[in-house]
């Protein structure tokens, strides 16, 4: 029980304080029998660790489902790339397929902290009133989950590598665009939601499957 306490506290904090209202009512497919099982097998048929988190991002639905303990815990609205899906460098497209979270960045940052090249910019913090558009600029805010592709030739390796393309899940100052494509390749979440996802996944094996639709 003691080992589970940090996870229970993180889940409680993430769902009750940070996270936006669960959006699964708008995506009933995620609550249907078989949804979790359909996203349980990693590339090569490998099964995820028992304490793993599975994140499924649907491009068509512009939504992210977080799976833990064999159930969907929460569905969040996202923005993927306005240019569509793809894996080529400089395409500004969101890559499909399986990834893992390679690095969690910004766990101690205050909400609205601006990051450049994954480093917090001292003194540059956007207030919550600036999270719904700030002069048209696209900021990386609050938290970063840096993705690493797991499928060689699709999102891993020369010419398609998600990690070297700096594909992140991150907070944004364009929260008003969530629910529709708007990014330059990354997966945007609201700043409260990215804090929730960070809290629920940090230190645990976390796999991200980016799909055309749920």
Predicted regions and their residues:
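N-terminal pre-domains immediately preceding structured catalytic cores
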Residues: 2-214
């Amino acid at each position: 029980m003691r080992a589970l306490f940090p996870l229970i506290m993180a889940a409680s904090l993430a769902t009750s304080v940070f996270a936006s209202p669960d959006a699964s009512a708008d995506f009933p497919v995620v609550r249907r029998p078989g949804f979790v099982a359909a996203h349980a097998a990693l590339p090569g048929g490998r099964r995820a660790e028992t304490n793993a988190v599975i994140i499924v991002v649907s491009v068509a639905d512009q939504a992210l489902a977080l799976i833990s303990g064999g159930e969907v815990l929460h569905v969040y609205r996202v923005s993927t790339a306005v240019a569509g899906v793809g894996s080529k460098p400089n395409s500004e497209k969101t890559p499909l397929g399986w990834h893992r979270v390679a690095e969690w960045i910004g766990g101690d940052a205050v909400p609205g902290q601006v990051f450049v090249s994954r480093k917090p910019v001292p003194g540059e913090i956007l207030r919550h009133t600036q999270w719904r558009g700030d002069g048209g600029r696209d900021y990386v805010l609050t938290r970063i989950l840096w993705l690493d592709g797991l499928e060689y030739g699709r999102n891993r390796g020369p010419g398609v590598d998600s990690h070297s393309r700096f594909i992140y899940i991150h907070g944004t100052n364009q929260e008003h665009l969530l629910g529709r494509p708007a990014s330059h390749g990354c997966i945007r979440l609201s700043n409260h939601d990215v804090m929730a996802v960070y809290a629920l996944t940090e230190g645990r094996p976390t796999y991200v499957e980016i799909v055309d639709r749920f």
